[in-house]
Amino acid sequence: GAGTIAETSVPQAEDFLWSELGGERRYQGDLNVWFSNQFSMQEDIPRYVPKNAADLHYFLHPGDIESVPRETIVGSGLDKDPVTYNDVFTYNLGYYRVENPAAPEAASVLILKDSFQNATIDYLSAIFRSVTVVDPRSYQETPDLASLLDADGIDLVLFFYHQNNVSRELIDFLSA
């Protein structure tokens, strides 16, 4: 197992490139869309990218050994107006994996998620050697949960869901 995550493994502010969305850029979050843009689009939204992002490797399918460009998984639409959640954070993909050979923790993590998790991948990939992300709502791959746990050498499973949003797809994925 991976053991306990040491305090020294928690990334610090200086480990990231920080920026604020808002101010000169309008940020249209999902909640604002749902409420017909009733909220300000000028709020400051923190955005951080690991300083070593160029050293991270992104994979789109289980078992892939050829990495894909970061923009395949993480939005790159900061030049849009307004900027949306998908322009800044990860897309709602059924599966992706991020490898960080220089991570302070050698653990491999599986995240079962909905869109609530999209903003956290850069932070988590700065900590763990491997972060495998599955969104059961759009997961189209062959490996079931047990196979993923084995194939990716998972040490830790995390659930990232909006409050009260446990989906039928998650239950089916866990039951398969």
State where each predicted segment sits.
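Extracellular glycan-modifying ectodomains
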Residues: G1-A176
